[in-house]
Amino acid sequence: MVWGIAIVIMAVSDDFGPALLLFATVLGMVYFATGRTSWMLIGLGLMAVGGYAVYQVSDKIQKRVANVIDPLANFETFGYQPSQALFGLSWGGMTGVGLGYGHPELVPVAHSDYILVAIGEELGFVGLAAVLCLFAIFITRGFHAAMQARDSYGKLLAAGLALTIAIQIFVVTGGVSSLLPMTGLTTPFMSAGGSAIMANYILLALLLRISNSANRPAEFDANALRRPRAAAVS
């Protein structure tokens, strides 16, 4: 059913970002719940079949895949944005041109989809790697909260929330570097967009709540100690 919903989302929105996020998150949670690799393989197969079917009928997705193969080949048309992103990253080098000295305005939608390009240009590979390391720590702590949760619902919820952030970072980083097609997903807590920022902060609040519950000492039940004593006296 989730596969069908994801396909409908791709067909209606003519974009595979939200569908990819939904399907990959659910697939990961199914694996966490069952531990069965076969479900992962079946899910990946369905994802490949659905993605190929939508690719055949979506001109927008075909262009994005073409940009991955060779963005510079279409520099004057639909390859301009990813080409400028690659130029910005290469211009940044290892240490960047300096905070505030870059030209993110040359990359269309740099404040949203391509925010990592602006960071890479001004802070270089070192600065961009530091940002990604912070996200990695955040994701790791999310999975740690999942392992520490005391009930199965909390474990699955925390794992799914951490996986949502991980998928977004992986897909966005691959997209801005032209290793993956751009999906329209935003960089959590950084890209412009009120609804995305609000959703990610709600996600963060849920993770903090689960972590707090896991670290809270177990409540002492005095009645549990009285019952055996009462039974012994009787």
Residue ranges and their predicted role:
Residues 1-78, 117-177, 202-206, 221-234:
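Hydrophobic alpha-helical transmembrane segments of multi-pass inner membrane proteins, especially
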Residues 180-223:
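Transmembrane alpha-helices of multi-pass inner-membrane enzymes
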Residues 89-126, 146-149, 153:
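Long extracytoplasmic/lumenal interhelical loops at the membrane interface
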Residues 9-10, 91, 179, 186:
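Residue-level marker of motif borders
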